[in-house]
Amino acid sequence: MRTPMLLALLALATLCLAGRADAKPGDAESGKGAAFVSKQEGSEVVKRLRRYLDHWLGAPAPYPDPLEPKREVCELNPDCDELADHIGFQEAYRRFYGPV
Protein backbone atom coordinates (compact mmCIF):
# COMPACT_ATOMS: atom_id res chain seq x y z
CA MET A 1 0.00 0.00 0.00
CA ARG A 2 2.77 2.39 0.89
CA THR A 3 4.97 1.51 -2.08
CA PRO A 4 2.43 2.44 -4.82
CA MET A 5 1.63 5.68 -2.98
CA LEU A 6 5.32 6.53 -2.70
CA LEU A 7 5.90 5.75 -6.38
CA ALA A 8 2.96 7.95 -7.37
CA LEU A 9 4.30 10.86 -5.32
CA LEU A 10 7.79 10.44 -6.79
CA ALA A 11 6.37 10.35 -10.33
CA LEU A 12 4.35 13.49 -9.67
CA ALA A 13 7.40 15.28 -8.24
CA THR A 14 9.49 14.19 -11.25
CA LEU A 15 6.90 15.52 -13.69
CA CYS A 16 6.67 18.84 -11.87
CA LEU A 17 10.43 19.31 -11.74
CA ALA A 18 10.97 18.19 -15.35
CA GLY A 19 8.23 20.52 -16.58
CA ARG A 20 9.81 23.45 -14.76
CA ALA A 21 13.30 22.66 -16.11
CA ASP A 22 12.11 22.43 -19.74
CA ALA A 23 10.14 25.66 -19.62
CA LYS A 24 11.76 28.73 -21.11
CA PRO A 25 12.08 31.71 -18.79
CA GLY A 26 9.63 34.52 -19.36
CA ASP A 27 10.63 38.07 -20.24
CA ALA A 28 10.54 39.13 -16.61
CA GLU A 29 12.75 36.23 -15.52
CA SER A 30 15.31 36.41 -18.30
CA GLY A 31 16.11 40.08 -17.71
CA LYS A 32 18.51 40.48 -20.62
CA GLY A 33 21.84 41.42 -19.05
CA ALA A 34 20.47 41.38 -15.51
CA ALA A 35 23.60 39.70 -14.22
CA PHE A 36 25.86 42.20 -15.96
CA VAL A 37 26.19 45.97 -15.82
CA SER A 38 27.71 48.38 -18.28
CA LYS A 39 31.35 49.38 -17.95
CA GLN A 40 30.35 52.87 -16.89
CA GLU A 41 28.05 51.66 -14.10
CA GLY A 42 30.67 49.20 -12.90
CA SER A 43 33.42 51.80 -12.79
CA GLU A 44 31.16 54.18 -10.85
CA VAL A 45 30.57 51.53 -8.21
CA VAL A 46 34.27 50.73 -7.95
CA LYS A 47 35.19 54.42 -7.69
CA ARG A 48 32.60 54.92 -4.98
CA LEU A 49 33.92 51.97 -2.98
CA ARG A 50 37.53 53.07 -3.32
CA ARG A 51 36.70 56.54 -2.14
CA TYR A 52 34.91 55.46 1.04
CA LEU A 53 36.98 52.46 2.11
CA ASP A 54 40.09 52.51 4.23
CA HIS A 55 42.53 50.26 2.37
CA TRP A 56 43.99 48.63 5.48
CA LEU A 57 40.85 47.88 7.45
CA GLY A 58 38.25 47.54 4.72
CA ALA A 59 35.97 49.85 6.71
CA PRO A 60 34.80 53.37 5.90
CA ALA A 61 37.58 55.85 6.57
CA PRO A 62 36.48 58.47 9.09
CA TYR A 63 36.83 62.08 8.14
CA PRO A 64 39.48 63.80 10.28
CA ASP A 65 38.02 66.04 12.97
CA PRO A 66 39.73 69.45 12.86
CA LEU A 67 38.88 70.06 16.53
CA GLU A 68 40.45 66.82 17.80
CA PRO A 69 43.83 68.38 18.79
CA LYS A 70 42.01 71.13 20.71
CA ARG A 71 39.73 68.58 22.35
CA GLU A 72 42.79 66.67 23.59
CA VAL A 73 44.30 69.87 25.03
CA CYS A 74 41.06 70.55 26.88
CA GLU A 75 40.90 66.95 28.17
CA LEU A 76 44.40 67.25 29.65
CA ASN A 77 43.30 70.23 31.77
CA PRO A 78 41.01 68.87 34.52
CA ASP A 79 39.14 72.18 34.91
CA CYS A 80 38.50 72.51 31.16
CA ASP A 81 37.48 68.85 30.97
CA GLU A 82 34.99 69.24 33.82
CA LEU A 83 33.54 72.42 32.33
CA ALA A 84 33.27 70.72 28.92
CA ASP A 85 31.09 68.04 30.52
CA HIS A 86 28.66 70.75 31.64
CA ILE A 87 28.61 73.35 28.85
CA GLY A 88 30.23 71.58 25.91
CA PHE A 89 33.73 71.34 24.55
CA GLN A 90 33.79 74.41 22.31
CA GLU A 91 32.53 76.81 24.97
CA ALA A 92 34.88 75.37 27.62
CA TYR A 93 37.86 75.63 25.26
CA ARG A 94 36.92 79.21 24.41
CA ARG A 95 36.77 80.19 28.10
CA PHE A 96 40.15 78.65 28.92
CA TYR A 97 42.20 79.14 25.75
CA GLY A 98 40.44 81.73 23.61
CA PRO A 99 38.55 81.34 20.33
CA VAL A 100 38.29 77.90 18.79
UniProtKB/Swiss-Prot annotation:
It is found in: Secreted. Residues 52-98 form the Gla domain. Disulfide bonds join C74-C80. Keywords: Biomineralization, Calcium, Cleavage on pair of basic residues, Disulfide bond, Gamma-carboxyglutamic acid, Hormone, Hydroxylation, Metal-binding, Secreted, Signal. Residues 1-23 form the signal peptide. The keyword Ligase does not apply. The modification 4-hydroxyproline is found at P60. GO terms for cellular component: cytoplasm; extracellular region. Gamma-carboxyglutamate residues are formed by vitamin K dependent carboxylation by GGCX. These residues are essential for the binding of calcium. Decarboxylation promotes the hormone activity. Ca(2+) 2 binds at E72, E75. The carboxylated form is one of the main organic components of the bone matrix, which constitutes 1-2% of the total bone protein. It acts as a negative regulator of bone formation and is required to limit bone formation without impairing bone resorption or mineralization. The carboxylated form binds strongly to apatite and calcium. The uncarboxylated form acts as a hormone secreted by osteoblasts, which regulates different cellular processes, such as energy metabolism, male fertility and brain development. Regulates of energy metabolism by acting as a hormone favoring pancreatic beta-cell proliferation, insulin secretion and sensitivity and energy expenditure. Belongs to the osteocalcin/matrix Gla protein family. This is Osteocalcin. The gene is BGLAP.
